[in-house]
Amino acid sequence: MRIPSISKLVFYWIPAAAMLVGYPFIGYDIIAGGFEIHGDQLISMQFLEGTYLYIIHHLLSFIPVFFFGIVLNWFDYRNAVWKELLVPLVMMALIFIAWDILFTALGVWRFNPAYIQGVSIINLPWEEVCWFFIIPFCSLFVYQIVKIRWSNPWGSARTLQFVLLVVLFGMYLLNMDRIYSATSLSMTISMIGLSLIVNWKGFGLFIASFLLLLIPMGLFNGMLTGLLTKEALVQYNSAEFGGIRILSFPIEDIGFGFGFLIGILLLSDFIKHRLSADYTLTK
């Protein structure tokens, strides 16, 4: 990983990312209402109908990873969490919690009171705040498995990065009138662009692990969007996303998760290399 100068980040990447993310908001009014209450239900699971749905979701995702990854330290995940991932995970979680707070306040999405406990932290259900720490912790276990088992598939995958940038930017231009679509795409574009700037060698590894991660994502995200319940826990404003769902969740959620996870890994590598460089300079 090449460590970019602060000036390069300040004068190039940060303004470009800010423009991509912020431009759709200029002079744009969120269309109120129009929430999609029902998801595309695949099967009804009665035990999920109630205010403990989000808690059940967290327990089902967290307990296996905690047991195998932390208690048994499979694939050296315990060391990876404490030494490399914990600090960047918390930092990125705070950024995405702010995004969640903003979009909830704007009416881009809302939370069904029938499936949450009713206790809020900064206008978010406390279960939602926990999501930003539990789910990346679980998701990065998949990344760690691929990292150990499959030695960096596709390398830096620069060609794939450029192709994704072109395709996603075209989609961004077509969806600038939908706030969630535009923001999800712009966040993904910004993170891929940053991985190019820093010449991150782990992009291919991340893509391989993210593709595998889409399998459990379908189930666990589906639990929150009406795949297994009569109504969705997270209800989206139909005017602010493209209307395409995978199982029961909007395709934009993939960009949300992509940006969140790759941001953690980029920040982790940046901190590791910056500390290493500082240590070398002071020896």
Regions found by a protein language model. Name each.
Residues R2-K283:
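Aromatic-rich, lipid-facing transmembrane alpha helices and their immediate juxtamembrane interface loops
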